[in-house]
Every structure is written in C-alpha cells, then in structure tokens.
C-alpha cells in the first residue's frame, strides 16, 4: 500500500515514520509513505504562499484552490494506481474500525491535511475527495488525523503485526465488534489483585467463553450502542455501522 500525504508541514511526520511497527513495515516494503509539501506548488514562488483571506470576511486564512488542485493532480499522477483521495476535516464521516478496514483494502491513499480555516470550498467541489473526521473536536491541522488513519490502516495490512489474530480480537474489529475483554500478564498477584483462575487453567474453550462473556459485559457497561441487538432496534445506528 502507498500513502501520499499532502501537507504544509511534512517534518511533523519525521519521528512518527521512524518508530515501532510502522518503521518496520516501511523497511520491509509492506507500506510506502510519501510526503508532499503543498508550498512546492505555490504560484507566489518567492514566499511560497498558498493561503489567503476568505471572501466575505472572517478570521483566519484559507488554503487556496489553485495550488491545492494542481498539487493533488500532480501527486496522483506520480504512481500508476489512482489514489483514494481523503480530506481530513471535522465535518467528515467519523473514522471507525469498519472504515479503517475498508481503507485497508485500498492500494493507494492520498491524505490531504488542512491548516488554518481549511480549504477553499472549490477544492472539494473539483476534486471530490472523501471527507473523514477522527472525532468531534478541532485540531490545529490535519497531520495528526492523517497519522491516526495511517496507524489504524497499516496495522491491518498482512504481515505488519506479528500475529494476525491480534487485530481480529481488538475492540470494534471484524472478529469482535464489541469492546475487547480484559487481559493480564505476570505477576499472578499484585497488591491483592489476582489473575482470574480460568486464564491459568489451560482450558481453551473455557478461556474463549470467559473472554466472550467479559467482552459483552464490558460493552453493555460502556458502549451499549455497539451491541448487535441495539443496532437492530436503531436503524440509524445500523446505517452508521454498515
């Protein structure tokens, strides 16, 4: 899979791309991540200016349509496979595990990171990108949201995780749409808190049953909206999860 990230601040990604599983995935050729500085497409060459004040007044600056559209088209042409274009915005579809799984089936994704007051509306009208949000809050720019999408998607690619079962058991995942069960490691006891006996029994069927029960109980307590029967009784929620 290839990611192309369009951003005003490509250096923000320096540390992120050289750590942990993502770095290993890049080294092993499982994923390619290219960063593109939008300022390289600035028409105002001396100052590399790609923003201007909004028509009608108001605070802040908008990213201009000309350099953005040209940049996205040029970047799209850098590889044979057309990119799935995604614009990061708090107004977009909420990122969830199902969407991450869908994105993981793509061969190439372009992430458009906004700044300031966002993009000129004509960027959306002309390029028709998917709009994705990581939550009902506002960030200084789309870079952190882009990292979130990359992280959520890359871990789903074959070969990235040491054990493919790991992603299936995660909360919200295709192997378990509910919240994940509690997990324990050594020591068996700490300050009076002990590991449940069933996890030490070696009885795999009993362990699986305990985990399923705990997963459901935790979901009922914390996220009842994730329960299948809740979705059936709430068509609007079902549509969101489909």
UniProtKB/Swiss-Prot annotation:
| GO term, biological process aspect, one | tRNA N1-guanine methylation
Record has Chaperone as a keyword = no
Molecular function in Gene Ontology: tRNA (guanine(37)-N1)-methyltransferase activity
- May I have one GO cellular component term? cytosol
- The answer to keyword Transferase applying to this record is yes
Top-level taxon of the source organism? Bacteria
User: Which residues of the sequence carry a binding annotation for S-adenosyl-L-methionine?
Assistant: 114, 134-139
Bias type Basic and acidic residues, positions: 223-233
| Pfam families documented for this protein | tRNA_m1G_MT
Q: Which NCBIfam families did the record assign?
A: PRK00026.1 (NF000648), trmD (TIGR00088)
UniProt name for this protein: tRNA (guanine-N(1)-)-methyltransferase
Q: Which organism is it from?
A: Rhodopirellula baltica (strain DSM 10527 / NCIMB 13988 / SH1)
The gene it comes from is trmD
């Amino acid at each position: 899979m290839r990611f192309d990230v369009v951003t005003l601040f490509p250096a923000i990604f320096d540390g992120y791309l050289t750590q942990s599983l993502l770095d290993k995935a890049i080294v092993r050729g499982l994923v390619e991540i290219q960063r593109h500085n939008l300022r390289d497409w600035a028409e105002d060459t001396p100052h590399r200016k790609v923003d201007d004040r909004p028509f009608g007044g108001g605070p802040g600056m908008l990213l201009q349509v000309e350099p953005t559209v040209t940049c996205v088209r040029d970047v799209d042409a850098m590889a044979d496979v057309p990119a799935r274009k995604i614009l990061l915005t708090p107004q977009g579809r909420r990122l969830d595990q199902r969407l991450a799984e869908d994105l993981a089936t793509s061969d190439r994704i372009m992430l458009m990171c906004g700044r300031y007051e966002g993009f000129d509306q004509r960027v959306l009208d002309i390029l028709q990108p998917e709009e994705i949000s990581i939550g009902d809050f506002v960030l200084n720019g789309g870079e952190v949201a882009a990292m979130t999408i990359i992280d959520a998607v890359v871990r789903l690619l074959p070969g990235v995780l040491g054990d493919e079962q790991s992603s299936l058991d995660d909360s919200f995942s295709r192997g378990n749409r509910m919240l994940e069960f509690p997990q324990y490691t050594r020591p068996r006891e700490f300050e009076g808190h002990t590991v449940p006996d069933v996890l030490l029994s070696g009885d795999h069927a009993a362990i699986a049953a305990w985990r399923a029960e705990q997963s459901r109980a935790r979901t009922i307590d914390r996220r009842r909206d994730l329960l299948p029967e809740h979705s059936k009784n709430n068509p609007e929620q079902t549509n969101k999860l489909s």
